[in-house]
């Protein structure tokens, strides 16, 4: 189109005519020009013939010619990238190509050229249309002049109604009739005619400018009916005409008002006399202001479709009007009201400004004009806020507003005093400034210089002023309308503005998250805590508003850090408490009712709830809980809950006719609400592992879980302040034995399983399938996915043990189709262990339901303790083997083949998973899906042991490697130093050096010798010993006849199989390992104390297998003596508490209240810090966990408990153990952080596919090596070791 000829122009005109002719009915039926434009813009969606129009075909061909080759090149690039492994769908490719095309030079040139050409074509069509219209009007004028002599009668009341267009002659007549010299009736009739005409016709007339001037002049007419008619015409124009026409009306009205306010002739109200809105002059003025304001609020909805100059003219005329200010002088002693006062009367909350600032299109113009020409508008708004605060400080609350409309009055008043007008203007200014601060360019308008003040008002000054307004401003009477008081009370209005700022993160960081503002918020609270005089008029309502803002600050990471540590996180000044400490102290005093000025207040429970809510935002995080721990808030909240619960129980049952009925109806709902609030506060302690320990110590875990179920059933939308959804709370609670029992007793598990069964077995059969299922069937139907993940979250080993231990399967002879499972045992019986025809017949969707059960079994059995328990109780391996045996067909007399189907493939996978131990390179798990080709499943199936060798990797490492010089140097450390502290540090340095340079050397017999010597010498240093020495004299003969649990026996066999595979153990190792385990149980039993508890895990010996002892036995190459002697020495070190899980089972070294919870220090200490460090070091992964409704603590607890068996290769397990033994127990935390950092990409991917917990439990840690992350872990040690070791050392009972 570079050569655009006249023929091309004619052709395009014809195409456009065809298009407009086709859509003529749609356009002419539109009520306004904006609607017509919208119809054209959406034509492709609404017109089925859209692509048949010649103009559309022309555009498509033009785009193809100009951009076709470039689009094809981009498509080829994307296709090649996809073939190289980048997984991107069709939509992604389209988006990429579209973006690249729109950013290209060719596209911009094409659009520029096309716009220029279309402008020429459209301009020519408009000119031709105007010529046709002129000729048509001439003909019409001639016809009218001929017909007026022959027919003076008309059926209508106006000749206008008989014409299609409003003629010029008629407008000239109206202009003459509107002249001030004309009689009143003539002028009124002219206005009546004008209002009857379509505004677009009037505005398109050539005399429109003159008419506009006449109307503007006539607005000053004293006759109210006449001005009302003009305003009616203006209103019609605003409603029905396009922007470029209504802009004329708006600017003329704004200019009129500006002149009106500047004129000395008009008798404007003064501030001292106030405003009587029944006064005719004031009424007329307010009508004009209101009309202007109504259009202000409507204009932003459509002005983006018009040239920017129209919008700018409207904005500038408005700002010019609002900037009009009457200066006081000796000639005019009284303050005359400015236009802004009247705008505040009709739009108190400055809604017009909110709408103008919403879109970037208009916001840019507003802010530019405010900065360059009308900054005085912002200055006066700030000045008004400053003056109002000074007024509040100078006068008592009840003297500030004698008739506080903002607090609500029963009788409607039509008079506004000067003080009330000042207050209304203050509210308008407050809302305007609040909206201004949201935007970056708006904040750049500060600081503001005020008259009679030396210092400028900065952003921080303004925010401090806002917070002071909450405390100093008058509070509303308690009996007034709640709605009114909430809408217009000063404290509520300021709080609304601060809430708005909090919701904008960038704005909040710049404005609110600094020590000056938080100190201003906390100052009266701090004074109340210390017992000194608080700010004047610091009411309970003000405190509630402040708590609301503090809760919002604490809900954002930057705000939380500010409250926890202040702006200077490295400050060592202990006397200056941070915000979190002040809030915690104040909340504790409130709970203990230790603040005298609030005693007996009806609002006290609300104040308590508000500040506990702030604390909840803080202690709901790991780092926040650490700061608030010394205040014992869990105990104070629990005490308050028990007191409230006891009071509610004492309320008598209302009896009809008794005097107590009314009092009970009033007290009971408030009491129940306060009790629920306290339970919710307690429940939120479960958001972190250590918080869950504190919750269980209070004894309220059952009530909290029951409350959670009631809330979960309502399925509430979790608001922004609640950072943790109930799904994460369930995961944390289910990670402990007591929590699992509480979930069972509350009915949560029953409700979950009932919902699962409804989706699994009772799903709709008439659901339309849009595509056939994959082969084999989709493992878990979409409707059941949520229930599946909920069960995966629930079934940690502590939960599995409490819910299934010592319970047999029902194994009924017959199952009713109406019989719905209600517990985990029922799920095992009906979906997993299908060992009878009765169970199979009871399932309506047998294949889908059993597949679901097998998938669940696969995930649960990834926890080796859970696998051993299920194997010991239900022999799941034999059940699966038997099912495989039955799923065969005979092909010859002595040979049978397996039937390949979805269930047999799933069973084969589970059998390999639960029978082979090994890391990512030590075992091979068969896939769950069939392959394309002639052999869809090349993996061998089996129905008896041993497993086919193809599932084990070839060439396991030999037990003894040739000793390296580095490991030799490491062992020599134990002989060369006289000072114990020196050799310990020297040995650790050498170990780190070896792990970084030659990690494979730390393996085999050399590793066993290293650990043995290091621990022996370490225990010779009393300062390194954490637990006391225990005398143990039992011999093999003493323990030989002791029995091991079935779980321990199965675990022992599993260990020996793995050790033989690795060439670490020899024949007879099983008996040696059995003796080691028996000695360990006897040795640890000497250090246990009796525990009275209903929890199964606390009754008797440790419930799981001792994976640490098994690992040590393999490291020591099956040497029983070395293994047990090492463990005896090792048991004195702090590290043993975190590596050797059974070490602290029912241990007398733990506090009694900790012992009774059944929670291991690995969970409430190590896992707690894993979550805390993960949030700080790998925030994306931390966020991914919470988006998935899963907790890092649960999977890390599983990894640590089984010493990473099945997740890491043997050499990496050795490195993990050696690292923790040599460098300290805190390295357990650092290793887990390194693992999660290593998995970051996979974790983010599986968060999107919504199967994160399944991935983490089932998948080995591919590619992870401890040595690769050694420097990273050393950095973590430098940053966190003091805090971690201090907390780890605090787990033991403190000697007094």
Curated annotation (Swiss-Prot):
Localization per Swiss-Prot or TrEMBL: Cytoplasm; Cell projection, Cilium
One Pfam entry name: BROMI_C
Domain of life: Eukaryota
Key words of the record: Cell projection, Cilium, Cytoplasm, Developmental protein
Keyword Cytoplasm: yes
Biological processes per GO annotation: axoneme assembly; camera-type eye development; cilium assembly; determination of left/right symmetry; embryonic digit morphogenesis; heart development; kidney development; lens development in camera-type eye
Result of knocking out the encoding gene: Mice exhibit exencephaly, poorly developed eyes and preaxial polydactyly, due to defects in ventral patterning.
GO cellular component, one term: cilium
Major localization class: cytoplasm
Domain Rab-GAP TBC: 1158-1281
Function: Required for high-level Shh responses in the developing neural tube. Together with CDK20, controls the structure of the primary cilium by coordinating assembly of the ciliary membrane and axoneme, allowing GLI2 to be properly activated in response to Shh signaling.
Assembly mode: Interacts with CDK20, which promotes CDK20 stability and function. Interacts with FAM149B1; may play a role in cilium assembly.
Protein name as catalogued: Protein broad-minded
Provenance organism: Mus musculus
Source taxonomy: Eukaryota, Metazoa, Chordata, Craniata, Vertebrata
Gene behind the chain: Tbc1d32
């Amino acid at each position: 189109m570079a050569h655009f000829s006249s023929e091309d122009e004619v052709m395009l005109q014809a195409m456009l005519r065809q298009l407009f002719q086709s859509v003529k009915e749609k356009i002419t039926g539109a009520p306004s020009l904006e609607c017509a434009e919208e119809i054209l813009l959406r034509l492709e969606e609404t017109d089925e013939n859209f692509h048949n129009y010649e103009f559309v075909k022309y555009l498509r061909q033009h785009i193809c010619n100009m951009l076709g080759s470039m689009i094809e090149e981009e498509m080829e690039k994307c296709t090649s990238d996809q073939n190289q492994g980048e997984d991107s769908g069709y939509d992604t490719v389209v988006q990429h190509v579209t973006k690249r095309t729109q950013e290209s030079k060719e596209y911009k040139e094409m659009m520029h050229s096309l716009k220029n050409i279309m402008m020429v074509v459209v301009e020519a069509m408009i000119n031709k249309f105007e010529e046709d219209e002129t000729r048509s009007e001439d003909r019409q004028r001639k016809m009218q002049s001929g017909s007026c002599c022959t027919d003076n009668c008309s059926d209508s009341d106006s000749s206008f109604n008989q014409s299609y267009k409003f003629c010029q002659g008629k407008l000239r007549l109206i202009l003459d009739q509107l002249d001030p010299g004309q009689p009143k009736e003539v002028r009124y009739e002219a206005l009546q005619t004008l209002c009857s005409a379509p505004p677009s016709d009037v505005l398109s007339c050539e005399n429109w400018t003159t008419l506009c001037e006449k109307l503007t002049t006539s607005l000053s007419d004293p006759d109210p009916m006449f001005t009302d008619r003009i305003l009616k015409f203006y209103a019609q124009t605003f409603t029905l005409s396009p922007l470029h026409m209504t802009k004329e009306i708006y600017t003329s009205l704004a200019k009129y008002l500006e002149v009106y306010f500047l004129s000395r002739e008009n008798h404007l109200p003064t501030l001292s006399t106030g405003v009587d809105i029944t006064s005719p002059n004031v009424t007329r003025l307010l009508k004009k202001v209101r009309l202007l304001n109504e259009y202000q609020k409507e204009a932003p909805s459509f002005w983006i479709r018009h040239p920017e100059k129209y919008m700018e003219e409207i904005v500038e005329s408005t700002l010019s009007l609002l900037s009009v200010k009457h200066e006081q002088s000796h000639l005019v002693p009284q303050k005359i009201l400015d236009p802004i006062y009247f705008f505040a009367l009709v739009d108190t909350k400055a809604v017009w400004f909110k709408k103008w600032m919403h879109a970037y299109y208009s916001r840019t113009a507003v802010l530019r004009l405010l900065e360059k020409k009308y900054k005085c508008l912002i200055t006066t708004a700030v000045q008004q806020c400053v003056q109002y605060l000074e007024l509040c400080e100078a006068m008592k609350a009840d003297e500030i507003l004698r008739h506080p409309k903002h607090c609500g009055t029963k009788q409607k008043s039509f008079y506004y005093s000067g003080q009330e007008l000042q207050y209304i203007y203050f509210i308008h200014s407050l809302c305007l400034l609040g909206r201004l601060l949201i935007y970056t360019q708006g904040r750049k308008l500060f600081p503001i210089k005020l008259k009679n003040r030396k210092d400028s008002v900065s952003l921080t000054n303004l925010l401090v002023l806002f917070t002071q307004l909450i405390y100093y401003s008058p509070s509303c009477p308690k009996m007034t309308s709640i709605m009114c008081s909430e809408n217009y009370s000063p404290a509520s209005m300021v709080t609304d503005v601060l809430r708005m700022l909090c919701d904008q993160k960038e704005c909040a960081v710049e404005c609110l998250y600094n020590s000056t503002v938080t100190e201003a918020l906390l100052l009266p609270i701090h004074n109340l805590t210390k017992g000194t005089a608080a700010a004047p008029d610091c009411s309970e309502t003000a405190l509630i508003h402040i708590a609301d803002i503090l809760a919002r600050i604490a809900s954002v990471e930057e705000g939380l850090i500010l409250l926890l540590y202040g702006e200077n996180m490295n400050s060592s000044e202990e006397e200056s408490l941070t915000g979190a400490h002040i809030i915690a102290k104040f909340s504790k005093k409130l709970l203990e009712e230790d603040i005298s000025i609030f005693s007996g207040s009806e609002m006290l429970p609300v104040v308590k709830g508000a500040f506990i809510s702030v604390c909840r935002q803080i202690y709901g995080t790991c780092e926040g809980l650490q700061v608030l721990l010394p205040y014992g808030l869990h105990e104070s909240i629990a005490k308050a809950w028990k007191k409230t619960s006891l009071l509610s129980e004492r309320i008598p049952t209302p009896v009809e006719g008794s005097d107590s009925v009314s009092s009970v109806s009033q007290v009971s709902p408030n009491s129940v609400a306060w009790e629920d609030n306290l339970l919710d506060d307690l429940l939120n302690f479960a958001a972190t592992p250590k918080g869950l320990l504190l919750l269980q110590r209070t004894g309220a875990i059952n009530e909290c879980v029951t409350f959670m179920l009631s809330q979960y059933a309502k399925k509430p939308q979790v608001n922004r302040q609640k950072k943790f959804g109930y799904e994460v709370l369930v995961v944390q609670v289910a990670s402990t034995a007591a929590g699992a029992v509480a979930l069972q007793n509350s009915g949560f598990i029953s409700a979950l399983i009932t919902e699962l069964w409804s989706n699994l077995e009772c799903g709709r059969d008439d659901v339309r399938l849009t595509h056939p299922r994959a082969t084999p069937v989709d493992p878990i139907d979409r409707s059941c996915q949520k229930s599946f993940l909920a069960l995966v979250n629930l079934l940690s080993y502590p939960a599995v043990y409490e819910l299934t231990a010592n319970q047999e399967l029902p194994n009924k002879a017959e199952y009713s189709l109406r019989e719905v499972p209600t517990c985990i045992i029922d799920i095992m019986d009906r979906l997993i262990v299908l060992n009878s025809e009765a169970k199979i017949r009871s399932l309506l969707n047998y294949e889908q339901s059993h597949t679901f059960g097998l998938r669940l079994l696969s995930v649960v059995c990834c926890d080796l303790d859970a696998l051993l328990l299920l194997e010991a109780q239900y022999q799941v391996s034999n059940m699966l083997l038997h099912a495989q045996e039955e799923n065969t067909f005979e092909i010859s007399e002595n040979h049978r083949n397996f039937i390949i189907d979805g269930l047999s493939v799933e069973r084969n996978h589970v059998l390999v998973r639960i029978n082979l131990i090994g890391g990512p390179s030590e075992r091979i798990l068969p896939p769950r899906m069939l392959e394309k080709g002639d052999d869809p499943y090349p993996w061998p199936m089996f129905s008896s042991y041993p497993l086919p060798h193809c599932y084990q990797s070839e060439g396991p490492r030999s037990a003894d490697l040739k000793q390296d010089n580095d490991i030799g140097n490491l062992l020599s450390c134990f002989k060369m130093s006289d000072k114990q502290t020196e050799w310990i540090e020297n040995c650790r340095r050498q170990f780190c050096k070896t792990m970084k340079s030659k990690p494979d050397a730390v393996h085999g017999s050399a590793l066993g010798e290293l650990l043995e010597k290091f621990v022996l010498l370490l225990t010779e240093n009393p300062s390194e010993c954490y637990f006391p020495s225990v005398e143990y004299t039992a011999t093999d003969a003493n323990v030989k006849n002791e029995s091991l649990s079935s779980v321990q026996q199965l675990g022992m066999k599993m260990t020996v199989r793995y050790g033989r595979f690795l060439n670490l153990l020899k024949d007879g190792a099983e008996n040696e390992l059995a003796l080691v385990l028996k000695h360990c149980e006897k040795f640890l039993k000497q250090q246990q104390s009796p525990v009275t508890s209903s929890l199964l895990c606390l009754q008797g010996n440790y419930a799981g297998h001792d994976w640490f002892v098994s690992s040590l036995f393999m490291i020591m190459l099956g040497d029983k003596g070395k293994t047990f002697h090492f463990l005896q020495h090792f048991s004195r070190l702090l590290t043993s508490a975190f590596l050797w899980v059974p070490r602290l089972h029912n241990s007398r070294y733990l506090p009694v209240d900790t012992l009774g919870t059944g929670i291991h220090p690995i969970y409430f200490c190590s896992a707690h810090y894993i979550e805390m460090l993960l949030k700080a070091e790998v925030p994306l992964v931390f966020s991914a966990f919470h988006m998935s409704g899963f907790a890092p603590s649960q999977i890390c607890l599983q990894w640590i408990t089984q010493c990473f068996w099945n997740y890491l290769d043997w050499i990496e397990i050795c490195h993990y153990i050696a690292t923790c033994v040599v460098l300290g127990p805190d390295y357990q935390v650092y290793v887990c952080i390194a693992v999660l950092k290593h998995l970051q990409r996979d974790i983010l991917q599986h968060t999107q596919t919504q199967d994160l917990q399944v991935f983490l439990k089932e998948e080995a840690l591919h590619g992870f090596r401890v040595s690769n992350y050694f420097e990273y872990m050393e950095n973590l040690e430098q940053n966190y070791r003091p805090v971690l070791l201090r907390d780890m050392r605090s787990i033991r009972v403190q000697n007094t």
